[in-house]
C-alpha cells in the first residue's frame, strides 16, 4: 500500500505538476498581456473582456485542481478546518470548470459575430457592448454557483473509517451519499449546461 502511494505521488509530481506550472504561467502571461494592452489603449471591446476573463478562470481552475491533487498543497493551505477547506476548494474547482465552458462558448460566439458578413443575421449583434458581455460573464458565474452549490452540503473531509457508500474525490475529500432526487437534479443541470453551451460553441465554430 505504501509503495503504491509513493508511486502515485511520483507520477503526479513528475507528470501533473509541470503541466499545471506551465498552464498557470502561460495563462498568467496572457492575462497580464491583455491588462497592459487595455491600460495602454484605454479601449475594451467585448471580445477583449472575454479573452481576458478566460485565462483568469484557467489559472483558478488549475490552482484549485493542483491543491486537490497534491497532499502537500492541500495540507499547507492555511485553513485549519478540513471540512471547510474541502468544500471551498472542490466548489471553486467545479465552478471554474463550468465558467470556463460558458466563457469559451461566449468567445466562440463573439468571434463568429465579428467575422460574419453584413448579410448575415448575426450582423445586428455586431454592436453589442462590453456591458452585455460583462452581464453574460456575471450570469455564467451565478449559474454555475447555483448548479454546484449542492457540493457545499455533501463534500466532507476523509473520515477515519471510509464506508463503501462514500464517493472518492481526493485523498482528503469525499462525497456523502446523495438522495436520488439530489443526484438526478445535479446530473440534469450539469448535462443541460454542457449540452447548451458546448452546442452553441460547435455551431458558432462551424459558422465561422
Swiss-Prot record:
Q: Where in the cell is it found?
A: Cell membrane
- Asked if the keyword Disulfide bond belongs to this entry, the reply reads yes
Spell out the molecular function terms from Gene Ontology: pheromone receptor activity
Q: What is this protein called?
A: Putative vomeronasal receptor-like protein 4
Membrane topology of the entry: Multi-pass membrane protein
Provide one Gene Ontology biological process annotation. Answer: sensory perception of chemical stimulus
Homology family: Belongs to the G-protein coupled receptor 1 family.
The cysteines joined by S-S bonds are 86-173
**Tissue-wise expression:** Expressed in olfactory nerve.
Keywords assigned: Cell membrane, Disulfide bond, G-protein coupled receptor, Membrane, Pheromone response, Receptor, Transducer, Transmembrane, Transmembrane helix
Q: Where are the transmembrane segments?
A: 20-40, 49-69, 98-118, 136-156, 184-204
Q: What is an example of a Pfam family matching this protein?
A: V1R
Topological domain ranges for the Cytoplasmic compartment: 41-48, 119-135, 205-208
Give the matching InterPro entries: GPCR_Rhodpsn_7TM, Vmron_rcpt_1
Q: What cellular component terms from Gene Ontology apply here?
A: plasma membrane
> Is the keyword Transmembrane helix assigned to this protein?
yes
What job does this protein perform? Answer: Putative pheromone receptor.
- For the Extracellular compartment, the record's topological domain ranges are 1-19, 70-97, 157-183
Q: Which Gene3D superfamilies match?
A: Rhodopsin 7-helix transmembrane proteins
Amino acid at each position: 500500500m505504501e509503495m503504491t502511494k509513493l508511486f502515485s505521488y511520483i507520477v503526479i509530481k513528475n507528470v501533473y505538476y509541470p503541466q499545471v506550472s506551465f498552464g498557470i504561467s502561460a495563462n498568467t502571461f496572457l492575462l497580464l498581456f491583455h491588462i497592459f494592452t487595455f491600460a495602454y489603449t484605454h479601449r475594451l471591446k467585448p471580445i477583449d473582456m472575454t479573452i481576458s476573463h478566460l485565462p483568469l478562470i484557467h489559472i483558478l481552475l488549475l490552482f484549485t485542481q493542483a491543491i486537490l491533487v497534491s497532499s502537500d498543497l492541500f495540507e499547507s493551505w492555511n485553513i485549519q478546518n478540513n471540512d471547510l477547506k474541502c468544500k471551498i476548494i472542490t466548489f471553486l474547482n467545479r465552478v471554474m470548470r463550468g465558467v470556463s465552458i460558458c466563457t469559451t462558448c461566449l468567445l466562440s460566439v463573439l468571434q463568429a459575430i465579428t467575422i460574419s458578413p453584413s448579410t448575415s443575421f448575426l450582423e445586428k449583434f455586431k454592436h453589442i457592448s462590453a456591458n452585455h458581455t460583462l452581464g453574460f460573464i456575471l450570469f455564467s458565474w451565478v449559474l454555475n454557483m447555483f448548479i454546484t452549490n449542492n457540493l457545499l452540503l455533501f463534500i466532507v473531509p476523509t473520515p477515519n473509517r471510509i464506508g463503501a457508500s462514500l464517493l472518492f474525490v481526493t485523498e482528503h475529500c469525499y462525497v456523502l451519499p446523495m438522495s436520488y432526487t439530489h443526484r438526478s437534479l445535479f446530473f440534469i443541470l450539469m448535462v443541460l449546461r454542457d449540452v447548451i453551451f458546448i452546442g452553441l460553441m460547435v455551431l458558432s465554430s462551424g459558422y465561422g
